[in-house]
UniProtKB/Swiss-Prot annotation:
It is found in: Cell membrane. One of its GO terms (cellular component) is plasma membrane. The lineage of its organism: Bacteria, Bacillati, Bacillota, Bacilli, Lactobacillales. This is Uncharacterized protein LBA1794. Its main location: membrane. Gene3D superfamilies: 2.40.30.170. It comes from the Bacteria. Keywords: Cell membrane, Membrane, Transmembrane, Transmembrane helix.
Length: 196
């Protein structure tokens, strides 16, 4: 080889474009970055069910020709009338939702998931709206059922959560109700999966 060959870029390009510099070293760097990142990235453990917006309190009174949605004043508060389909002589008085700062989200979980749910855990209730986007109400678990109830032939536990109102919500609306039961890093998660 003469000295002109050493000066050409063709010689160095051929010499240093081997398999290890093009594939193995970048892949090793990527794996190293993923391992380091797994120590800092947080993974949330959740349990999910369908939740229903319900009032925090109701009053049952005798029906005196009330109609559905009528606003009446009782006990120095305004209430909205809801007629009971099963009992014609009873009406339920619901607090006006806009006057309240919070609502109850009632959801049901099977026995294999109820052990992870504890009082005070965060809830992110998701409601689909007419715009095609999702509204989110943030709250926390207020009560966890201690004995199962029969719902559509299944034994489930009732979980009542209290959520702050900041969206246009109506009683009876249903949505996705994930409850965050714990947090861990992805490194701890993969370590537990591999070792167990």
């Amino acid at each position: 080889m003469n000295s002109k060959d050493y000066e050409s870029t063709e010689f160095y390009s051929y010499k240093f474009k081997n398999f290890s510099t093009m594939i193995i070293i970048p892949m090793a760097l990527l794996v190293f970055i993923l391992i380091i990142g797994s120590f800092f990235a947080i993974r949330q453990s959740t349990v999910t069910s369908t939740g229903i917006v319900e009032p925090q309190s109701t009053l049952d009174i005798a029906n005196k020709n009330y109609h559905e949605g009528q606003i009446i004043k009782r006990n120095r508060s305004k209430w909205m009338v809801h007629l009971d389909d099963k009992k014609e002589n009873i009406v339920h008085l619901l607090p006006i939702i806009k006057a309240k700062k919070s609502v109850n989200i009632v959801t049901y979980f099977p026995g294999n998931k109820i052990g992870a749910i504890k009082k005070g855990q965060p809830l992110h209730f998701q409601l689909s709206n007419a715009n095609g986007t999702t509204d989110r109400l943030v709250g926390e678990v207020k009560e966890v059922g201690i004995y199962p109830v029969n719902l559509h032939g299944n034994n489930v536990y009732e979980v009542i959560c209290k959520a702050k109102l900041d969206k246009d919500v109506k009683y009876g609306m249903e949505g996705n109700a994930p409850i965050i039961t714990g947090k861990s890093t992805y490194f701890e998660y993969f370590k537990d999966k591999i070792l167990n």
